[in-house]
């Protein structure tokens, strides 16, 4: 049986493309590679569980202590036992190999939205100048997606216009004392010379501050890293039951390899993940939304795009610690574990850096202790004294500062090589100087040695491999994401982005996927 549309991937892009089609009455099949059920997050409040839960090692480290042992993982979320099924097996299943680059993806239902930071923003006109459609073409889709998933963080601050989302966002949850003190001083001293060019405000998040459908608002449990039992943090997996009720079909456990042209549609070739047995699915149209890297591997294999080097966009990262010097040694208190504040800085070159500030009090202490350059016992003491007076910062830099390449070998393996140069180092050093000066003006210090560059690819913001063009060549996409050389195959994820801003891109990707779904629903009837 040939479906009207098969969507490969059930992450944010896949479900956003699906909704307009399902609502229009199309026969839509969503396919992902998930097997089994996800491990539920712990129940309770983080600090209370740390004091009282006699089985906390199970969710902190895992039965095999993998969270403690796996020091190679680029992010704390990759070591969380309850999230192991989100990440495991991705590169192997999709035949992806890397050199100097972290290729992270998900085979789980909901994809990487099971473990993302929930940061959202709307790309502005300048950031979308290279996209071959009008910025206003996304207006209806931004509104629909934002209302569907629920946003918070609305504030009259320096970042309202920058994020462009406050008409759809609710108020944000309360800030902890460190974040509240930092933003209060910033608002009082915005004219200070050290703060010129640095914009600071509330983080805008796909987080509920009031109930939405079956999802409950945030209760500040502090367990965000492990997953949210209340559904306050958005995951595309939350939408799958509603899509099925509306008429969509689901097929799980299938890893897609390539697509073959038929006389009147397409045949999707894959393997059953649990058995390795080959399987096929037929459809009039196919939408690839498996995440940029997996989507690229599928598309390039289908196009026989062998031994041709292509770019991979990704945001270089850096991390740092801010210390509030006036309040060392406070006892930790319950509070938020998600990003509380965001910042934006534009370099003299005009390029943008974006970042967020978190409380470390609801993250495993060993994630910080291991970076303190002293003995383990001394590091624990230092962190016990200072940890409750710190904020953790992460920063995303322009994708143009890195030069990653991908190539598909004739045996179908996608190989990605990470590359960067002195320009990236200089930009990180420049941002570090900005923050050191700004922190002093705000009553904080950047802890010495803490402004460190992350592994290339560890941002997990991959894009640009199948870029949109006004007149696409083979292997590029048109203004709706249709893949040149494969009419009837569409790309819904960030592989279509011709450029990648440092600003969070997921909501823009979802709006583009919604626009694609509306387009497909309008050009043919079921």
Language model segments and positions:
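Conserved redox-cofactor binding core of oxidoreductases
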Residues: 56-72, 77-83, 93-98, 102, ...
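N-terminal Rossmann-like FAD-binding beta1-loop-alpha1 element of flavoenzymes
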Residues: 5-30
